[in-house]
Every structure is written in C-alpha cells, then in structure tokens.
Amino acid sequence: MHFTLGFSPCPNDTFIFDALVNQKIDTEGMTFDVYLEDVQTLNDWAKSEKLNISKISYGVLPIVQETYSLLSSGGALGKGVGPLLIAKKPIVDLESVNEMKIAVPGINTTANLLFSMAFPNAKNKQFLVFHEIEAAVLSGAVDAGVIIHENRFTYLDKGLVKLIDLGAYWEEKLNCPIPLGGIIMQNKFDQNTQSKIESLIKKSVEYAFENYPQITDYVRGHAQEMSESVMRQHIDLYVNNFSIDLGIEGKKAVETLLDVYKKTNAI
C-alpha cells in the first residue's frame, strides 16, 4: 500500500520518521511519498485533506476530526516543552500583553491556543512562520512573540527575554502534559490499516531511540543551520515515551486540550 506522508524538517520529526521513510525497519509493504513542510503548511493541508498521514499541531485537531483520526504514536507531548512569550525588554505587568502586537506561529497551532488561554483579551496578533518571529521582535515589527521549536534555545543569545512560559502556565492550570503535535491519518482507511501505520511509526521511534545519541545524516541534512548539540536538545525536549504511545495520560491530555479549545474558541 502507498501513502502520502507529511511532517516537518525539525529534528524531532526527522528523528521519529527516519527509520520508517528510509526503510531501516521492515515497513511490511507500506511505501510513502514524503512531504517535509513547516507545521502551519501541514495544518492548512490537513484542513483540505491533502495528505493521507500528517503531523499537525494539536490546535488544529478539533477542526479536522471529521476527516482524520489521531494516531497514538509519533506525536509530541511533554512537560516543560511549551511555547514561550518573548520580548526585547521585561515588562512590569503581564496585563499589558493584552495591548501589545504579538507575533504568533500560525493561527491553527497549539501555540496560539495556549497564548489565547493565557491572554484571552489579546486580539492584536500577527501570524508568522515560527522561524520569522525572533526577527520580528528584534526589528520592532511586533512588541512580543510566541516562540516554539529551536527558537526556545536561541532567543537568549539574541538578547531577548522571556515574559512568560506558556507551557508552564498550562501545566500549572491543568496539571497535565502539553499536547504540541500529533500524527493524523485519513478516516477513509480502515482501522486495521490505521493500526498498521501506528505500529510502524512506533517501531520507527523505538529504532531511533536504540541508536541515539547518534545523529543520522537524514536528521542532520534537514537541520543544517543547527549545531548537533541543538539538534539533540530538540530531540530530548520533544521526543519521549508519549512519542512511542500516547497511553492513558497522553490521551487524557489531548481530551483536555479539546475541552480548552471549546471553551476559548480561540482558533
């Protein structure tokens, strides 16, 4: 069977899918056309049902649930891994964030959902690709920005400061891991096929962990601007046991996020 598969070029995703797409494991006759795109593009594609299997932000899951099913493997959940709100200078009162122009990495992202949960009255948002946000803050194009991925490791080097850890805010309020990104598969495939894909992704993650901390050429080739230490930070932060299987705790966290979505109607 042949599938279209999309995920991001970020080290956590290439680490997870390397063994699967490069046939380092037995793919049991399953083959893939692979699309590597930023998460906002993948979110948009999911809304138009472009791909059979895709990484998405959990923030877009409520919108695509009628056409896609969430798989239990390959995703990113965790603690201490959430988005950060950063600026050029500290502020005295976080309430002033409501009056600021804020850069956010995409409308249908978990980052936007978490920001909206913390600052429901902040309406002056500019939606940018995640790697453009630091520059927008530094140039003064926006007053502050919500950063994700490797920018969590680089903002201090650029002289920026953290205003609030949105992930910590989530954990404090809701006492569960943060669902950041998940893997979805079109509902047109039967449960048996979905389970096979889920199992293959699980095996791919397990294979990657067995060979870690080696950084493969596949991971390195899609993260050429990063040092290997930053690649490992990225993997260590976003790939864990929840990536192998959501389990009961992970599934409860996803249900919590869906409840928050309904309450905030932020996206």
Give the predicted meaning of each segment.
Residues 190-260:
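Secondary-structure end/capping motifs
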Residues 38-40, 46-62, 129-130, 147-153:
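Beta->alpha turn/N-cap motifs
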Residues 3-4, 67-76, 101:
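A structural signal for short loop-to-beta-strand junctions that line the ligand-binding cleft
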Residues 45-47, 137-138, 197, 261:
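Hydrophobic residues within well-ordered alpha-helices
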Residues 2-22, 36, 83-143, 150, ...:
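Bilobed "Venus flytrap"/periplasmic-binding protein-like clamshell domains
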Residues 27-41:
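A short beta-strand-loop structural module common to alpha/beta enzyme folds
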Residues 130-219:
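Pocket-lining segment of extracytoplasmic ligand-binding domains
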Residues 70-93, 170-188:
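Hydrophobic/proline-rich hinge and linker segments of small-molecule sensing/allosteric domains
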